[in-house]
Amino acid sequence: MSTRATRPGMLHQKENAADAQAGKRQRTAAGSAARAPLSANAAPPAPDPAIEFAGRDDVDALLNEKMKGKNKMDYKGKSEQMMEYIKKLRACIKWLLEREDTNLAEIGKLNGLLEAAEKHHSEIVAQLKSAIEESKAINEELQRQYASLEENLKRVEAEKLDALRSYGDEKEARIAVEASRNEHLEDLRRIKLEEKRLNDQIKMLQDTNKRLQEYNTSLQQYNSNLQADATKNGETIAKLQKEKNTMVETMNGLKDHANSVKMQLDLAKSSQNEALKQKTDLLKEVDNLRGELQQVRDDRDHKLAEIHSLLADVSTYKEMTGKSVAELDNAMTRSTALEETCSSQAERIKTLELQLASANEKLKRSDLTTMETMTEYEKQKRMLEDLQLRLEEAEQQILDGENLRKRLHNTILELKGNIRVFCRVRPLLPNESGAVAYPKSGENLGRGIELTHNAQMYSFTFDKVFEQSASQEDVFIEISQLIQSALDGYKVCIFAYGQTGSGKTYTMMGNPELHDQKGLIPRSLEQIFQTSQALISQGWKYKMQASMLEIYNEAIRDLLATNRTTVQDGGASKYSIKHDANGNTHVSDLTIVDVSSINEVSSLLKRAAQSRSVGRTQMNEESSRSHCVFTLRIFGVNEGTDQQVQGVLNLIDLAGSERLNKSGATGDRLKETQAINKSLSCLSDVIFSIAKKEEHVPFRNSKLTYLLQPCLGGDSKTLMFVNLSPEVSSTGESICSLRFAARVNSCEIGIPRRQTQVRSLAQG
């Protein structure tokens, strides 16, 4: 049980044995340099035995520790702290070396056990084959002996006939036959025992083989469990997506209701404003009426005073002058008219007061309705905020689940060593009709694509499928982690494949002048420079070198050469491709430029774009007539840990495959088309050989495949974009591209290795 339980770990240790041995050599070199005397007269002080490290957190805490003094001039305090910090660093290095020695010893022990087990298994298989061959030989010998016995029996019968004629001869023959029979019976018994022993041995070997098969099955089950976990996470993501959709629908309903309530509130506010306006008008009118009433009252009082004055005058007149009754009646008439005017004014005042009370009542009802509407609006607003919060949580869960699925998927792909494949479909032009569809749900959502050709449906599944509506930003987000790997010390290769006019150059380069239309190459370089600047605070310093070439008619051209004549004419013969022992690719005499900012790289890309070969065909106004390869070499060193990394980023825009009957190529365009199709055919042959795991892979059949050899047959992280045209007339070519992409997706090229080492003191 313990042997089987440790075998997966042993296999894992075996896969990383090469890395462990390389790391051991690097550690030995670094360790010997680190243990070299720092001066001719003094050895470094021994690490403090009281300093202990429990794990990586303690090491990180030590590396993040900052020197603090009482003030800027406290050099003695800082020096003491620095000496204590150096002691801790020495203790940390010693602990790391001891831990690495322990790990290496354990790895060596496990490798020894694994080799012994494999050797024992080989011996058992050889013994089994030998036993089977021996058993066959024994069976043949037994058959020959049986035939011999039959012949002897016939001979004995003949001798018996002869014995009838001679008793003496019969007796001797009988004795001889009995003796021979006993010998043969003994031989037969021995043969049966030997056969039983061999059968037992065969059974034991079969049991051993069965246990090995069970162990292999357990490894396959382990891989299946990883895939099942990935599937389960996918189902969880789909469930969360469904819940998100439900919440979005609910939120949309609430938004509609909130909008309705808001409209009602706006109407209520409008009514309230109208009522307030009416109230203001009524108040103004009441004030006017009150002023008029006061004026009427004043007039009435004035008239009454006049009446009293007239009455007094009448009395006076009667008494003093004895005026006529007619004059008195006239004065009385005037007095009555004034009294009627006062009465009508009083009635109007009462009417205005009633109108004022009614307006106040309407205003109160309007205020109450407004308060109720505001309360309902606040309630709906809180509910909407709650749903919005729940929606954000669900979206975060979906995002976390998607990130987990991506990590698991990437882990599985790295364990399998497969080339990743992304599919991107360009938008339809106004005069085109589409033949592409996508799964709307299920595990293939976002990963599947369906094409209809001649009334038949073709379905394909890749690591990611981008629909026509996907932006350049959406595409780059999916590969940003892969770009980060180049800074971490990995070799990364991304190339675009597809028929002419399918959007490869737009995907890789885009329009660098417009932010929304920038392609993968400028966006990748922006991320690398931004991240490298951010890592300066952690002690990292990076040096970067850029180069760019094209393969035109099976000839290499340097796109960064300062002399454009060299680019366009026959200077390509001096460029040769070489691969070193570490899997790094070099092109002789190629222009390599040191770059330190995105602006420098942008100017290089502009210069290269002006030199690249493009031409007009019936299928594309600006068709790329060559394969373009941009390479960025990254050299990083951490001043604090002396760790060095070396990464390579290859971004490749392949020329598009095209059919002569559609492109209408003639003359130079015909020659270019033939060269492009030939190199892409060689690439297809290489992929086919890798997929079939053939011993010989024809990398040297073309410049393109030989240049891509480390990416397709080495330890690189490789991603292919297959670009498609969605129009109906291109479905045949699109299906060919998708079949090629599916074959690429199934290729296992090995687990990517990180290029890192520890810098020696001499280098420092």
From Swiss-Prot:
Molecular-function GO terms, alphabetical: ATP binding; ATP hydrolysis activity; microtubule binding; microtubule motor activity
Binding site for ATP: 498-505
Biased composition (Low complexity): 29-50
GO BP: microtubule-based movement; spindle assembly
Parts forming coiled coils: 105-416
InterPro entries, sorted: Kinesin-like_fam, Kinesin_motor_CS, Kinesin_motor_dom, Kinesin_motor_dom_sf, P-loop_NTPase
Pfam families in the cross-refs: Kinesin
Record-linked SMART domains: KISc
Region described as Disordered: spans on this chain: 1-50
Highest taxon listed in the record's lineage: Eukaryota
CDD domains xrefs: KISc_C_terminal
Keyword Oxidoreductase (UniProt): no
Gene Ontology CC annotations of this record: cytoplasm; kinesin complex; microtubule
Domain Kinesin motor, first and last residues per copy: 418-747
PROSITE patterns per the UniProt record, alphabetical: KINESIN_MOTOR_1, KINESIN_MOTOR_2
Keywords: ATP-binding, Coiled coil, Microtubule, Motor protein, Nucleotide-binding
Family membership: Belongs to the TRAFAC class myosin-kinesin ATPase superfamily. Kinesin family. KIN-14 subfamily.
Official protein name in the record: Kinesin-like protein KIN-14N
Organism: Oryza sativa subsp. japonica (Rice)
Organism lineage: Eukaryota, Viridiplantae, Streptophyta, Embryophyta, Tracheophyta
Gene this protein is translated from: KIN14N
